[in-house]
Amino acid sequence: MLTLTLLLYLSFITTVFSKKVIYEAENGKLDGVSKYNELQGYSGTGYVGRFESAGNSVTVTVEVSQTGMYDMSIIYCGNMGQKINSLKINGKNSGDITFPENSSFEELNIGAVYLNSGENTVSLVASWGWIWIDALVVNDTPNVAKDVSPHINPTLVNPKAIPAAKKLYDFLRSNYGKRILSGQVGGAGQAGDEGQEIQRIQKATGKLPAVWNMDFIFESNDCTWRPENPDITEMAINWWKKYQGKGIMAAQWHWNIAGKTGDFAFYKKDTTFSIDNAVTEGTWEYEKIIKDIDRVAGHIKKLQAVNMPLIWRPLHENDGDWFWWGNNPKSCAKLWKILYERMVNYHGLNNLIWLWNGKNDANTPVDYIDIIGVDIYANDHGPQTTAYNTHFDFYGGKKMVVLSENGRIPDIQQCVDQNAWWGYFQTWNSEFILQDSYHTDAQLKEYFTHKTVMNMDELPSFNVNSYEYQSGNNNNNSSNNNNNNNSSECFSIPLGYPCCKGNTVVYTDNDGDWGVENNEWCGIGNSSSAVVCWSEALGYPCCVSSSDVYYTDNDGEWGVENGDWCGII
């Protein structure tokens, strides 16, 4: 992707209107761009363009009387199509800006930016170039700092959310605007993998990230290869039990479809799969996505069976055109609603917190979204304030905004200073966390031990059986864990789980036999009468009388009773 640095050093102020100060681009220092005056509607004596080659730039210096957040806008013409450009303030990345296609010069509000008292360099960094810039407009009076927490929606969009999901959402909401949670993405298809990424963080900082991210990348039906045991769900359950519910798990789904060459793929260039057809009932594409959703839902049911909430990020980065579900706002919003309806209302998955990571426009399914995610891979540790404000303001301050993916961790102190309250950051795996070119040990220690950052050791347990939403109170120190420990003593008590009243085994590990009661794991004492009912962990009952096998998969043999699947034991 062509990256053009448009370093705007405008040498002087040309016009002052009320509180708005206009900096004419054509009066700046130009490098590789030219002045033009053919288009109508520009201010001053012209405009600059077209930013065709790397290194092209126009430079402006903005001077303000006091440090603070200043509203800024750019007057541009985008008659060469929609372009995405980035903004730099004093050499630090502040975020990406989408310039919609238009036919004449318009003023685009890009939100508030942090400026120091005195001179500041403002840089417009174009990812795509090919745009006309007329002027930069800055308010000469700083804004009052935003109070981000009071207006966040107090409840999840799913009214049937399980107590564990409610508690997690309340915890995130009560800390929003006060703390930033640390996060890390594991290897592809991994869940809670304490591999090289976690080892690097722990060695450099002595901390474990609060949020861990997994990927259902290999769980579509078209995948012809999957990792060997343990599977992703088993890994997640082991992680949940190891930390006794004190971690936060997030997940995306690189949704693989049959590719052009007979393999599977999620990139648009590698498949002919049509999202428009996929959201149209009666098509084979529609039937295909329903089967895929059902398969992934089966995995998430296992997480719900152990009372694990999940921050769920399907259809991620849908504002781009690289994935087959991307750059099609209407159909993508429709697919999102299909996912929600199928998972929540059909499969009864009430452990999900729905994170939207994509395009913000009139099509955005706002009523089906809990949290907003932004993915940013910057070439420095800037706070990405403009990107934060753009997303926060679009939702009227009612939804938390997080860095659902980042390359470099933003400078935490700058985030605090500039009121860029990312709910959490979540660094991508491999070189992004392992190589010093992205993060040195000193930087990792600085960020993970910053007083604003919350790591795993500060989390409460989210494994609860009952919970009511709080009115913005910080529940950081509250347990709310209503496990029934009055049952007869068994191996699970020291692990933080109650004893089962019954004897139906749904899972066995080195600790012993586990059952599920009241949507929570419980330990089964040694009993020769234990009944192994593996299907309950998948959300299906055991067969009572039927022994006819209708279907066999990796989980076991399935029968049918009362019009529903049941597990044969």
Swiss-Prot record:
BP GO annotations: substituted mannan metabolic process
Segments forming domain CBM6: 21-139
Reaction equation(s) it catalyzes: Random hydrolysis of (1->4)-beta-D-mannosidic linkages in mannans, galactomannans and glucomannans
Signal peptide: 1-18
Protein name: Mannan endo-1,4-beta-mannosidase C
Gene Ontology molecular function, alphabetical: carbohydrate binding; mannan endo-1,4-beta-mannosidase activity
Active site residues per record: 317 (proton donor), 405 (nucleophile)
EC annotation from Swiss-Prot or TrEMBL: 3.2.1.78
Protein's organism: Piromyces sp
Binding site residues for substrate: 284, 322, 377
Pfam name, any one: Glyco_hydro_26
PANTHER family with a match to the protein in the record: GH26 DOMAIN-CONTAINING PROTEIN-RELATED, MANNAN ENDO-1,4-BETA-MANNOSIDASE E-RELATED
Protein family per UniProt: Belongs to the glycosyl hydrolase 26 family.
